Amino acid sequence: MARRNFKVLYVSGESSPFVRVSSLADYMASFPQALEEEGFEARIMMPKYGIINDRKFRLHDVLRLSDIEVPLKDKTDMLHIKVTALPSSKIQTYFLYNEKYFKRYGLFSDISLGGDHKGSAERIIFFSVGVMETLVRLGWQPDIIHCHDWHAGLVALLAKTRYAKHDFFKKVKVVQTIHNVYRQGVFPSKAFQKHLDPEVCDALDMEGGEVNLLATGIKHADLVTTTSDRYARQLLDDPELSFGMDKALKACGDRFHGILNGMDTRQWNPSSDKLIKKRYSAEQPEMKLEDKKVLLEEVGLPFSEETPVVGVIGSFDQYQGAEIVKASLAKLLELDIQLIVFGSGDKEFDQALKETAEENEEKMAFRPEFTDAFYHQMIAGLDILLMTSRIEACGMMQMFAMNYGTVPVAYAGGGIVDTIEEVSGDKGTGFIFTDYTPEALTAKLQEALALFANRERWSALMLECMGRDFSWSTSAGQYAELYRNLLG
């Protein structure tokens, strides 16, 4: 008898190319496809933020998925679904939309991130209940609901409480994956008590009048995973690194697993990438120089083959390198490099970077606005990718970079060291600094620059990077085994 294809729903707050804030978006763009190749039927649900361009991504309405009722404790709101396929795949991606909750707003935010989180608790409640109601209307019955980060923690709880009695969800299993442990979805409990029944509220992870949605997802999931085995061990052993999640994770026992990220080697392939100007391969690495020229022209910096171009990419907050980038700028600009910073932080960070770039217009460029096309062009055109996150569960950007012959210089946080082999003699793929200080960062970058000056050795390093296998093949197989064991 042929084995039935199990159905897996992936719930996330972001996914490339539709909207990107963190590496979670890159993960969502490739991981479901890898699991389809393992014999699972995958679909995705995420919010339809107002910033997502319907025309660009070919989102279309589905008549039978319009006017879905989302029953809350104190009211019933209406939900509308738009759908498209994940690019280069047949994976259906469903966008949950309500004008009041999503038209004028960006991504979800919470207390821990500061900024404007007003209304986010109500939005996440609406989205989470909406996911469950959409599945019922759709008639697509998942075997597993795979929840990603705090954005989907409430979905895990709803599946195990309010909807557990529903015939449609009686057999469903829940997996919760941690990508960003310091982003935990912390909110005052008031909105949850207002909009959710006592049965659900009583099961929330709550302390001091605040709800923690990541902890809620961990508590109620059948399996909990994170994006590298090393990072999983660190979360269990280091309360500071886990931001207080170590107790919840220890309580999981053998339900907690670390599986290394992979990458989509079709989407991120310099020989076939449609988003870069000049394609190249390990057989023609010299063509990468053309992408360097294009990148520098795009940001308004002069081209020199001998001057290394160093890039920093991120959503810069206190854990993703905002402070160390600002503190290192003066020293970095003393080096014989050109520097491109791509991504934004708070207003103070953006203003400081903008002013520094204007004062050093021959050496530095700052691009705060994210576009997928520039992201690819930057990965292709850089000589060195400088990774400044203090906490990185695994990351995928260093994998993209190495696949394009761009050498990473990274802080040894989380699972980074599972994917970058420190350069030693003729071996290795990158440079890792272990002290999170501007001095250590600059010193390690200078090691890379010294090697860059030796063109023969640098070319060999580029080829070593491009020869590594970062595909999902191994990791997807590990997830497939977890899924099948969970389903019995």
From Swiss-Prot:
Keywords: Glycogen biosynthesis, Glycosyltransferase, Transferase
SUPFAM superfamilies, sorted: UDP-Glycosyltransferase/glycogen phosphorylase (SSF53756)
UniProt xrefs under Gene3D superfamilies: Glycogen Phosphorylase B
Main enzyme class: transferase
Catalytic activity: [(1->4)-alpha-D-glucosyl](n) + ADP-alpha-D-glucose = [(1->4)-alpha-D-glucosyl](n+1) + ADP + H(+)
InterPro entries xref list: Glyco_trans_1 (IPR001296), GS/SS (IPR011835), Starch_synth_cat_dom (IPR013534)
EC number per UniProt: 2.4.1.21
PANTHER family on file: ALPHA AMYLASE DOMAIN-CONTAINING PROTEIN, GRANULE-BOUND STARCH SYNTHASE 1, CHLOROPLASTIC/AMYLOPLASTIC
Name of the protein in its database record: Glycogen synthase
